[in-house]
Amino acid sequence: MLAKPFMWIILICTATVLASCTGVGRHSEQGFIYKDIQIDTTSASTGQGSTIQFKGNPLPLSGMSIQVGDKLRSVNLAKGDLSLIDVTDTGGSVRLINVVPSLDTTVCEQQTHYLSEKNQGLDQQIKLITISVDTPFAQDRFAKGAEINNVKFLSDFRGGAFGKTHGLLLEGPHVLARAVLVVDGHNVVRHLQVTPDLGHMPDMEKAFQVARSLVNEKG
């Protein structure tokens, strides 16, 4: 059993990191209201020894590093019905994988809405996936409340295996770093961006561009 002071440190760290996205965004009759959130165009490294910033403080990443050209690694994630699926199960499709700390936060919410609503028809050609450590039940509530039907939600709540296997797990708060990956039909990572600052958006348009180029290659 963890000592009480250590448990409190983890709880405080988790609350602090999730505050990086501070408060869930608003919706109107016209749909989701996008906020002016800074977009990072560079990428942090993944894996043990790498860090990302939050309010000027470094947060260490854990796990095995992954980079463009590597293959996505086999790990089981939970679907909405709690059944498991291997993240490498591509079905031969190009996939855009949206990785967020928690859907119950503004930046994460906006990042996922952007994936769903701004992909300009890519959802008809590739698979859109969002991975977080939220429980499958929380992901399902989010998807229904946000009326997002074109994104598959997968949960890494069972110990953060996806994060550890791909160097995207934040050690202290035990949430995933903010990232976007484009993976081809052979499970090769063709694009990877990890936001250097946890409170910033990734460059989703760049990810869309890479995914579209892979679709054109197949065509």
Regions found by a protein language model. Give the residues of each.
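N-terminal targeting signals for export/organelle localization
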Residues: 2-8, 17-74
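Structural microenvironment flanking redox-active thiols in thiol-disulfide oxidoreductases
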Residues: 109-148, 153, 160-162
